[in-house]
């Protein structure tokens, strides 16, 4: 059986958790391959809401093996808090497998993330302050702490002492903060070792062996394409690859083993943190989208910036990821609008109109959206289970977005519940 990639086509928060849940009964393994607890996903099952940050969505489905891949950076305190919360609600988390090569977020990563963001002032990126960026920076600088290091105390202490030799100089002399005690950091991590050990494995070998035995593996991205460190709106991005290429490097599964790439897109657009957002609404309609769509971050609780659907950005995500199927979510939120503009192009400062993402950051920051306006429907969609059940104007809206994306829409979300979906085509 194949590997399937599921990712976001916008700036994250597209509803990937619900899409994973729809697939869960047809998959055997569910893998997080990037990011850390800066990403959040919410799933509603039988009226129960589950909000998670590190654990793969598949943990909620009996029989599915949830895997945290080597591309993830793990805050072990957050991981075990999530496990304990789910266990208290009757969810079996004993199947969880964690890559020995995943990197670990330490206390000094969190401190550096917060003080750096404050130091930047108005130029700040808008990070969650959870140490994600500094942990990835250490990974690339080859001074990071990996999960496997927790089982070799000597190596762990050497790595932490070496890292803090430099970081404490920065904290004390530049940021006017106190130095961090390497012994305390190491002791904290070693305190997790015994509980963590039974979960740890060579996940690349595990997943490739599963594919060899005709199992289905779902590779689940955190964040979204436009937050990808290489292909997103840099520098206002996350620190990992949230695109299809990241699924390979973050899991150890080769590209020829991937059969489908499913992108999730909201029927409008949201963004958290700083950075360009061409269709952002600064008026009552933006606030209305935020209120009706409950657009507040799962991880931070911050209100999300809201705007109309950006077909230019979504089409870019289709190309970057080689998308085969689209899941459109939150169509029901738009039921409260008489008219619904869709961004079909950008107008550059020099007056040119383009239908592709501008090459430079400067151009993107100064584009104006070119809208085509469609009539709304103002009817409840939550009971719709086929395209024909939708009002004509809602059908027209979906068909227009599909035409602009150039990729078939396989699922349409018409509410937060697992059953509030229209399945146009099987995803697996």
Curated annotation (Swiss-Prot):
Its cofactor is Mg(2+). One of its GO terms (molecular function) is magnesium ion binding. The keyword Lyase does not apply. Binds 1 Mg(2+) ion per subunit. One of its GO terms (cellular component) is cytoplasm. Keywords: Cytoplasm, GTP-binding, Ligase, Magnesium, Metal-binding, Nucleotide-binding, Purine biosynthesis. IMP binds at residues 13-16, 38-41, 128, 142, 223, 238, 302. Its EC number is 6.3.4.4. Its main location: cytoplasm. Transmembrane segments: none annotated. It catalyses: IMP + L-aspartate + GTP = N(6)-(1,2-dicarboxyethyl)-AMP + GDP + phosphate + 2 H(+). It comes from the Bacteria. GTP binds at residues 12-18, 40-42, 304, 330-332, 413-415. It is found in: Cytoplasm. GO terms for biological process: 'de novo' AMP biosynthetic process; IMP metabolic process. Pfam families: Adenylsucc_synt (PF00709). Belongs to the adenylosuccinate synthetase family. Plays an important role in the de novo pathway of purine nucleotide biosynthesis. Catalyzes the first committed step in the biosynthesis of AMP from IMP. Homodimer. This is Adenylosuccinate synthetase. The gene is purA.
